[in-house]
């Protein structure tokens, strides 16, 4: 089920969209690129579709915010949900000074 609302401007659309404890996805419809950018930046959701309905592709992350969950599945961000990143500091060996951090995935 989806709800459709006609609003006066981008500000009203953002207020209406954010007035919920959920934030999985939004679909906005406009012919104005600047308005689309304001909506994308302003709506608190895991994904925004402009002039399109919800779509999914295994190459891009999928997930929500607020009570719609946290973290992502699919894409490189989804893969990282299943790994632990370990930080390792390695000092120069054989009498050398200094050290540098390395992230190992």
Language model region names:
Residues 1-105:
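Conserved C-terminal structural/oligomerization subdomain of aldehyde/semialdehyde dehydrogenase
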């Amino acid at each position: 089920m989806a709800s459709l609302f006609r609003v006066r401007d981008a500000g009203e659309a953002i207020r209406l969209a954010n007035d919920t404890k959920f934030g999985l996805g939004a679909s906005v419809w406009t012919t104005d690129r600047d308005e689309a950018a304001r909506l994308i930046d302003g709506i608190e959701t895991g994904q925004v579709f402009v002039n399109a309905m919800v779509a999914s592709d295994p190459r891009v992350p999928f997930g929500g915010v607020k009570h719609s969950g946290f973290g992502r599945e699919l894409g490189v961000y989804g893969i990282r949900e299943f790994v632990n990143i370990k930080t390792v500091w390695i000092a120069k060996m054989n009498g050398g000074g200094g050290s540098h951090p390395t992230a190992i995935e």
